From Swiss-Prot:
Family statement: Belongs to the phosphoglycerate kinase family.
Broadest EC class assigned to this enzyme: transferase
Origin organism lineage: Bacteria, Bacillati, Actinomycetota, Actinomycetes, Micrococcales
Keywords, comma-separated and alphabetical: ATP-binding, Cytoplasm, Glycolysis, Kinase, Nucleotide-binding, Transferase
Gene label: pgk
Record's GO cellular component terms: cytosol
UniProt-recorded name of the protein: Phosphoglycerate kinase
Domain of life: Bacteria
GO molecular function, one term: phosphoglycerate kinase activity
Coiled-coil boundaries: none
Residues involved in ATP binding: K211, G307, E338, G367, G368, D369, S370
Cellular localization per UniProt: Cytoplasm
Catalytic function, reaction form: (2R)-3-phosphoglycerate + ATP = (2R)-3-phospho-glyceroyl phosphate + ADP
A Pfam family the protein falls into: PGK
Length: 415
């Protein structure tokens, strides 16, 4: 059954009602400063719509991975401050999740006001494997909303987690799908069910083990898989090439060889780099040179060299493939983009995605490090067809997995 939506809730009327909304506010911090507020901005439309409609809004979110207890390093205080700036209204911050302060502030909320609960992961029950423990916390969360309350799930970046604030609370209140989740699912459905051809997938990041299931699934759906990032070296090694001191997952070699055989037998074409930027070590100022992919240990640093980016020839070839696509999905940087000397491969891929989008294709940046990379490198969000707020959730959807935070909202909401 299709999920009821935020619009359904707004049409039913929310004035005077308390609405819990699970948002994705898991943003990077430098001390007390939010360094990338993309997820906060993406969460604001639903929060603003509820507040302007007269709801008493209680926002739930996590930040980082605290160990199930309060930790000042993971407090949502900087997030509340930035949210208030962007919202142009006060955002109160509770000192706890469902404790005395949260209950008192929730009870004192007036129509149109916004309260942010402290990091939900400060309560160990949020991520518990024990269903009863999570349900107990969800019951306390639901109690903050009262008898006429409602729940909106709008944290796409967390929907692959079976956590109390994402999954269990939806069973204890009338539950509605937020616009961010709806928009993400619409795009991902296009990628999995009806992608326009040619369909090119760009995969990077450090570990091939993180991408095994998505490669397995996309080999039968995409036309071309472009492989970069640290994961490429396991592919090169599987082909018999030496990779020096580059990142290598030897326990995945047999799996990768099987993928290469499937590709050769008619599945999606796997395209590997033909040249690599090899460095003397993992450092921004490391000496580096461009070497052919089949001669990575032939340079000045021999077998001690490590690959930190795809080479210029590969960057041009990947960009050409991307520009010629009607559908592009990208997850994972091509190199260590945080170091300027090793950012050019990622920059070339990002630029090509913007060009594919400008030409009328669908370009999707799959969240996580890829989203951080495009912003770090100065690209505007609206230059891409879609930037996902959930890297892990996007991948699990493309793997064909069920997302608990989505299925929890699929029951019929009631106003």
């Amino acid at each position: 059954m299709p999920a009821s939506t935020l619009n359904d809730l707004l049409e039913a009327g929310v004035t005077g009602r308390t609405v819990l909304i699970r948002s994705d506010l898991n943003v990077p911090l430098d001390g007390d400063t939010v360094t990338d507020d993309g997820r906060i901005r993406a969460s604001l439309p639903a929060i603003r719509d509820l507040a302007e409609a007269g709801a008493r809004v209680i926002v739930m979110a996590h930040l980082g991975r605290p160990k199930g207890e309060p930790d000042p390093a993971y407090s949502l205080r900087p997030v509340a401050a930035r949210m208030a700036e962007l919202l142009g209204a006060d955002v109160a911050l509770a000192a706890d999740v469902t404790g005395d302060d949260a209950r008192a502030q929730a009870a004192a909320l007036q129509d149109g006001q916004v309260l942010l609960l402290e990091n939900v992961r400060f309560d160990a029950r949020e991520t518990s494997k024990d269903d009863a423990e999570r349900a107990a916390l969800a019951g306390e969360m639901a109690a903050l909303a009262g008898e006429d309350g409602a729940y909106v799930g709008d944290a796409f970046g967390a929907v692959h987690r079976k956590h109390a604030s994402v999954f269990d609370v939806a069973a204890q209140l009338p539950a509605y799908q937020g616009p961010l989740v709806a928009a993400e699912l619409e795009v991902l459905t296009r990628l999995t069910e009806s992608p326009e051809q040619p369909y090119v997938v760009v995969l990077g990041g450090s570990k091939v083990s993180d991408k095994l299931a998505v490669i397995d699934n996309l080999l039968d759906k995409a036309d071309t898989l472009l492989i970069g990032g640290g994961m490429l070296f396991t592919f090169l090694k599987a082909q018999g090439h030496e990779v020096g001191a580059s990142l290598l997952e030897e326990d995945q070699l047999d799996t990768v060889r099987a993928y290469l055989r499937r590709s050769e037998a008619g599945a999606a074409r796997i395209v590997l780099p033909t040249d690599i930027v090899m460095a003397s070590g993992f450092a921004a100022d490391a000496e580096h040179e461009v070497l052919a992919a089949d001669a990575l240990t032939s340079g000045a640093h021999g077998a001690s060299a490590m690959g930190l980016d795809i080479g210029p020839e590969t960057a041009r070839a990947f960009a050409e493939q991307i520009r010629g696509a009607q559908t592009v999905f990208w997850n994972g940087p091509m190199g260590v983009f945080e170091f300027p000397a090793f950012a050019e491969g990622t920059r070339a891929v990002a630029r090509a995605l913007t060009e594919a989008s400008a030409a009328g294709g669908l370009s999707v940046v799959g969240g996580g490090d890829s989203a951080a990379a495009v912003r770090t490198l100065g690209f505007a969000d609206d230059a891409f067809g879609h930037i996902s707020t959930g890297g892990g959730a996007s991948l699990e959807y493309l793997e064909g997995k069920e997302l608990p935070g989505v299925t929890a909202l699929a029951g019929e909401g009631r106003a």
